[in-house]
From Swiss-Prot:
Lineage of the species this protein comes from: Eukaryota, Fungi, Dikarya, Ascomycota, Saccharomycotina
Bias-annotated ranges (Polar residues): 1-15, 30-60, 68-85
Family of this protein: Belongs to the protein kinase superfamily. Ser/Thr protein kinase family.
Binding site for ATP: L322, G323, K324, G325, A326, F327, G328, V329, V330, K353
GO terms for biological process, alphabetical: G1/S transition of mitotic cell cycle; intracellular monoatomic cation homeostasis; positive regulation of endocytosis; protein localization; regulation of iron-sulfur cluster assembly
Organism per entry: Saccharomyces cerevisiae (strain ATCC 204508 / S288c)
GO CC annotation: cytoplasm; mitochondrion
Protein name: Serine/threonine-protein kinase HAL4/SAT4
Keywords: ATP-binding, Kinase, Nucleotide-binding, Serine/threonine-protein kinase, Transferase
Length: 603
């Protein structure tokens, strides 16, 4: 006998011999089937087969990773049974990372409005009309960008004992929105998670969209042919970037400023010389107290054929390009079958920086430059500074530097892909940056080229300073007085004003100035100005605004008074009044910033 009626016609009466379902479970099953059919009968439009219509709208949104921005105030997740979002009670999640019942179609349409690097010129131009930087995404979209890191294939936090409701198969329209969440000890939602006690975690594995952006940036700073191909993806920016920047009422975005440097470099080097972070930097002696020994240092570098053959055994094979610049190329090196502590075999990755000799550079200056950079970087040992491992010569006679590999990419790409960072995430990176700068200054080293492109990130959010090609040793261990620096060094938006107007200056406030500009770039997604000179209207507006009661609008938008006061002090145009790194860390704002566990300073 089959119980056939209007509500359960498709559910036959089960016999105890075939099924062991209790009557209560069977009743719930029939009730769910009944409500499902009633929902279908009320609409002629069938939902996609991969969407569970019994899930409430808010839960459904969270399950598919469809986020809409609300407020940036953290709140407690009150539904511990929600396995699609944060599944444990007592976890904080910023509300701008939470879903607010968006429809599936509207979220897909919103995501389609974001620029894709592989789109045609016409579609790219249409997406770029509202902003000079068309690659900026909303803060919530930045969470979807990193969703690939949470898939079983790429996750570093997967658990074989995970028990969650199977997610529906993603369709072409929502493939970029699906967050595959696992029930780990620390539930993940996108790239940033805040716990109830105020601690947080970063998950910065690059996603496809971020990888495309990173590839385009590599091409931008590569040969002229590659730059031409990359420019085709952003025609509105390339059309007349100088006019665009001047006509815009807002300061230039990070990407627009980067594009301006690329175009300016094309004008300066029509043959397609690669760009560099160091602009108009004069030749100088890094180790002024040890100039005579710098030439002899090259004899300690690996040069024999036998040693070159040992490189593959020690560091593995070099593969894809990670970055390009005037110095040369950075490649990733993979060494397989590395024994781990648990006895299993794994792989280890390294970054290999290939030095290139400049056209107007003699062999002696070339050797001095690379050995000076290697000596400085290899002598610095800090959590927030990239570890330099080795210096050797390849088969072509080019010198190469081996460094640790940072899987999270660089801060520039992250900010451009996200549009801007919320304060908790930016504060964590900022405090790590200041810790690294304080350590450098204590060691008598000044970087002089701090910018988001030279700040690397691990997959778990540890910030590391890299590229010491322009760094200086301003004080040796046995010296009491510092050596003053001179010349203009670095990328123009981050160059301190004293570099333009003084022949000699203390290099330490120069790094602090750059850190202040970097923080504002993280929080606003824009550069404060093109250069800190009197002919720059944005810089002049800043000088005027900092003296007025209302302040300078971009800095005033930070809302927190403690933060604003420190940033104003870091960006003081008078160098000797500028706050130093230790004062930043000891300020009220500096003390209240909570770094992630992996970002805590370990010397």
């Amino acid at each position: 006998m089959t119980g056939m009626n209007d509500n359960n016609a498709a559910i036959p009466q089960q016999t105890p011999r075939k099924h062991a379902l209790s009557s209560k479970v069977m009743q719930l099953f029939r009730s769910g089937s009944r409500s499902s059919r009633q929902g279908k009968a009320s609409s002629n439009i069938q939902p996609p087969s991969n969407i569970n219509t019994n899930v409430p709208s808010a839960s459904k949104s969270a399950k598919f990773g469809l986020h809409t921005p609300t407020t940036a105030t953290p709140r407690v997740v009150s539904n511990p049974s929600n396995t699609a979002g944060v599944s444990k009670p007592g976890m904080y999640m910023p509300e701008y990372y939470q879903s607010a019942s968006p429809s599936h179609s509207s979220s897909s349409a919103s995501l389609n409005n974001h620029i894709d690097i592989n789109t045609s010129k016409s579609s790219s131009a249409a997406s770029l009309t509202s902003s000079v930087s068309a690659l900026s995404l909303s803060p919530t979209s930045a969470i979807n960008i990193s969703s690939k890191s949470l898939s079983p294939k790429f996750s570093h936090h997967s658990n074989s004992n995970t028990a969650i409701t199977p997610a529906p198969t993603p369709t072409a329209s929502n493939i970029n929105n699906v967050n595959k969440i696992t029930n780990t000890s620390a539930p993940i939602c996108g790239r940033f998670l805040v716990h109830k006690d105020g601690t947080h975690e970063h998950h910065l594995k690059n996603a496809k969209r971020q990888e495309k952006l990173s590839t385009m940036i590599k091409n931008m700073v590569g040969a002229s042919k590659l730059r031409g191909e990359a420019k085709s993806a952003v025609p509105d920016i390339i059309m007349d970037p100088k006019t665009t920047l001047k006509s815009n009422k807002n300061p230039p975005t990070l990407f627009a400023g980067f594009m301006k440097q690329v175009v300016d470099m094309d004008d300066k080097y029509p043959e397609g010389a690669p760009t560099s972070g160091a602009l108009n930097c004069p030749e100088r002696d890094i180790y002024r107290s040890d100039q005579k020994d710098s030439k002899n240092n090259t004899h300690n570098i690996t040069t024999t054929k036998k040693d070159r053959q040992c490189f593959a055994e020690k560091y593995g094979r070099c593969q894809e390009v990670l970055g390009k610049g005037a110095f040369g190329v950075v490649r990733i090196c993979q060494k397989k079958n590395v024994s781990s502590q648990d006895g299993n075999k794994s792989e280890k990755l390294y970054a290999v920086k290939e030095f290139k000799r400049r056209t107007s550079e003699s062999a002696e200056k070339y050797s001095k430059r690379l050995t000076s950079e290697f000596c400085i970087s290899s002598s610095l040992h800090h959590t927030n500074i990239v570890t330099t491992l080795d210096l050797f010569q390849d088969a072509k006679g080019e010198y190469c530097e081996v460094m640790e590999y940072c899987a999270g990419g660089d801060l520039f790409t992250l900010v451009v892909a996200a549009g801007k960072l919320e304060y908790m995430e930016a504060d964590c990176f900022f405090k790590q940056l200041i810790r690294g700068v304080v350590y450098m200054h204590e060691m008598g080293v000044c970087h002089r080229d701090l910018k988001p492109e030279n700040l690397l990130l691990t997959h778990d959010g540890v910030l590391k300073i890299t590229d010491f090609g322009n760094s200086e040793c301003f004080k040796m261990a046995w010296e009491k007085n510092i050596h003053l620096s001179g010349g203009v060094c670095g990328s123009s938006p981050y160059i301190a004003p004293e570099e333009y107007i003084k022949e000699e200056f203390d290099p330490r406030p120069v790094d602090i100035w750059a850190c202040g500009v970097i923080y504002m770039a993280m929080r606003t997604g824009r550069q404060l100005w093109s250069s800190a000179e009197k002919d720059d209207p944005f810089y002049m507006n800043y000088l005027k605004g900092r003296k007025e009661k209302g302040g300078y609008e971009p800095i005033e938008s930070l809302k927190r008074a403690r933060c604003r006061n420190v940033i104003y002090s870091m960006l003081d145009p008078v160098p000797y009044r500028r706050i130093n790194g230790k004062q930043i860390l000891n300020s009220e704002w500096g003390r209240e910033i909570k770094c992630c566990h992996n970002g805590r300073a370990l010397k």
